[in-house]
A protein has these predicted regions:
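Terminal, non-catalytic domain-edge segments
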Residues: 1-160, 195-198
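C-terminal beta-strand-rich structural cap/linker in extracellular carbohydrate-active enzymes
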Residues: 77-78, 183-203
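Intrinsic-disorder/low-complexity peptide segments enriched for small residues
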Residues: 124-126, 174, 189, 201
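Surface-exposed beta-strand/loop patches in extracellular or lumenal glycoproteins
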Residues: 158-174
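Short acidic, gly/pro-rich beta-turn/loop elements at beta-sheet edges
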Residues: 165-167, 179, 199
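Solvent-exposed beta-hairpin/edge-strand motifs
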Residues: 170-185
């Protein structure tokens, strides 16, 4: 994306990744799917150690985007949109959440989380809760959602590699909004190449 970088060089934010997956779902042209995944997996190429924020001006590389928090918000936005798009694509629509308009300035990613979606036929709302889930494999991402009636926590695991991956997952009961006394949920999971799994935990 050239954006408004001018002398700073191309902008390295790959906000178009989810859009490319949508194009792939419509055209079945694998170049869109492959470009989306290559762009997303390269997101950690130049990350500032102090702030944890990726650079997106070509001339800065791993110096980071700066101390302004809105730089991180943009990156959270496109990554989350991409993960939701991958989940929808891999599940053939069994995982689906409504999206808002495309955001201006940075790219083509869209907002989510303002309305319930569907996970495996059940209405659910996206949740982002610090320390709720941990996985011991950096090649696996996850999305969390809670059923509308509050009875089920969904953890959607996504393998980001073209090979099988194994992982150990922990869901910490202390981060669950449940009236029941629960133990931490642990599970060993095997994921196929670019595969996904829906883990359902009763609350």
């Amino acid at each position: 994306s050239m954006g408004s970088a001018v002398n700073a060089g191309p902008i390295l934010l790959t906000s178009h990744c989810a859009f490319f997956l949508k194009l792939y779902s419509l055209t079945k042209d694998e170049i869109f799917r492959d470009m989306a995944r290559l762009g997303a997996l390269g997101r950690d190429a130049f990350v500032n150690e102090e702030t944890g924020v990726a650079s997106y001006y070509w001339n800065r590389f791993d110096h980071g985007a700066g101390l302004f928090p809105h730089h991180a918000w943009w990156q959270i936005g496109w990554i989350y949109d991409y993960l939701l798009a991958e989940a929808e694509l891999r599940s053939n629509g069994k995982i689906s959440f409504p999206r808002g308009f495309m955001t201006p300035k940075v790219g083509t990613h869209r907002t989510a989380g303002f309305a319930s979606g569907i996970v495996d036929g059940k209405k659910a709302s996206l949740i982002l809760r610090k320390d709720l889930v941990s996985v011991d494999n950096p090649n696996v991402d996850y999305i969390t959602a809670e059923s509308e009636d509050g009875s089920v926590l969904f953890v959607v695991l996504l393998n980001n590699q073209a090979k099988e991956n194994n992982l150990n997952m922990i869901v910490r009961s202390s981060q669950l909004a449940s009236d029941k006394e629960m133990k931490d949920y642990t599970k060993q999971v095997k994921l196929n190449a670019f595969g996904y799994k829906i883990i359902k935990i009763k609350l």
